[in-house]
Amino acid sequence: MIQEAIARLLGDNDLDRTTAHGVMEQIMTGGATDAQIGGFLVALRCKGETVDEITGFAEVMRAKATPITGGREPLVDTCGTGGDGSGTFNISTTVAFVVAGAGCTVAKHGNRAMSSKCGSADVLAELGVNVEASPETVGKCLDEAGIGFMFAPALHGAMKHAIGPRKELGTRTVFNVLGPLTNPAGARRQLIGVFASHLTETMAGVLGALGSERAFVVHGSDGLDEITLTGPSQV
C-alpha cells in the first residue's frame, strides 16, 4: 500500500482517511522498509498534509499506544510540534509546570529532540526526572502530583519502525504534527504550538475529528511554534 500511496503523493494527490490509516498501519507493524518510510514522509511533506490524512495516521497511533490512566479530569497537554528551527528553550515543558501549579492536571506528552536542539525529554532528564517511568508510575504522578510525563518512544512502541528514517532525514515530518495528537492519557484539552501558520486550521480540524473538547492551536508570526512575544500570534 505504501508504494501506491507514494505514487499518489508524487502526483500531488491527497490520500483519503482510509488509505492514510492503512499506510500508518503498514509502517507501525514493520511492513514498510526504511527507504519507503523516508520516501513517503518526504513526498507527503512536499504535497502538504490534509485533515483526513493526519486524522487517519493519528487514529492508528492512538490505537497502538500504551494507555495511561490516572489524574483528575479534565487532563491538559501542552505539546508543540517542534521543528521551528528557532533554537529556543523548550517552552512547552516550562508551561506544563506553570499550568500544573495553577491546579490543572497535566499529562505532558513528549520526546527527545528529533529536528530541534532540545526536546521535552532532554530537559526533564537533565532535571533528574525518570522520563522512562512505567505507565503505572506516570498514572500515580498524575494522581498525586497533578503532572506526569509520557515519553513517546516508551508508550508508542510501534513507532520504533519510523525512528531511523526520521533521524536520518533530520527535518520535520508529519510525525512532528502527530506527536501532540496522540496523547496516551487521552487528554482532550490541549495547547498545541505548530511550526507553520497554515497548520493552525489543519490541526484544529484534526482535533475536532478526533473528539477534542477544548484546544488552542498557535503559531508565532516570527516562526515560533509558540505564542510569541515579538509580534502577533495566530490562534
Model regions: which residues?
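Acidic, glycine/proline-rich low-complexity segments that act as flexible tails and inter-domain linkers
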Residues: 1-87, 102
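Electropositive phosphate-/nucleotide-binding environments in soluble metabolic enzymes
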Residues: 3, 14-21, 31-38, 48-55, ...
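Glycine-rich anion-binding loops and their surrounding alpha/beta cores
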Residues: 8, 14-15, 63-68, 88-89, ...
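Short glycine-rich loop/turn motifs that provide flexible caps or phosphate-binding loops at active sites
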Residues: 11, 29, 47, 79-82, ...
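Short beta-strand segments at enzyme active-site cores
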Residues: 36-37, 106-109, 217
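Core alpha/beta catalytic barrel or barrel-like domain that forms the active/cofactor pocket
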Residues: 69-79, 107-113, 175-178
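A generic, well-ordered mixed alpha/beta core segment in the N-terminal half of proteins
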Residues: 80, 84-141
